Amino acid sequence: MTPIERTKIVLGKFFTIAFAGVTSALVTVLSIALWTAVLSKGEAGEVLVTFMASIDAIDYLLVFFMLIPVVAIFAAVLLTLSIYARSFKEAQGYMTPLVFVTIIPVIFAMLPGVQLKGIWAWVPLTNVALAIKELIKGTMDYVQLFAIFGSTALIAGSFLAFCIYWFKQEKVLFR
């Protein structure tokens, strides 16, 4: 028997974490789509019905696809933190600040007047949140959407590459 390469171990762990995240994203988007369909049948106010009916199925699909590289970013970061941590409790301690680092860029996307222009198009997580907002409003520039998807995927790939590099370091594994 030959030992398994460390890269394969990291990728196996990464895809396990990412699968859970993608499944969660899919359930969330499907739930939103289902409730949109229910509310657009006339159960809500007329303004809400008009708004909900204007969201196409392709928009929901694009929202889901925009979440995939975000899931990959978090899977890589969480895996990196879990490799570094000596125990579950220590890993939880490292992951708590990650929640705040995550929430802040998304909150900026919800502020009035913040649009998917200029610097905001390049701020990770904020750009995805703004793109999702633009998709729902029906005002998304699809060329910009692909640029945001690509830049987010590039960040996710960089984090995964760092995770693989770090997992190969003896000093991290046996500290």
What are these language model-derived features?
Residues L11-A44, P69, I73-F74, L78:
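Hydrophobic alpha-helical transmembrane segments that constitute the membrane-spanning cores
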Residues R6-T7, Y142:
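Alpha-helix N-cap/start motif
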Residues F19, L61-P69, I119, G150-L154:
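Hydrophobic alpha-helical transmembrane segments of multi-pass membrane proteins
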Residues T80-R86, A153-R175:
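Junction motif at the cytosolic side of a transmembrane helix
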Residues M1-E5:
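Short helix-to-coil transition segments within interhelical loops
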Residues A57-I58, A85-W122:
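Transmembrane helix segments
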Residues A53, I107-W122, T126-L154:
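Membrane-interfacial helix-loop-helix junctions in multi-pass membrane proteins
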Residues A33-L62, G138-Y142:
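Membrane-interfacial helix-loop-helix connectors in multipass membrane proteins
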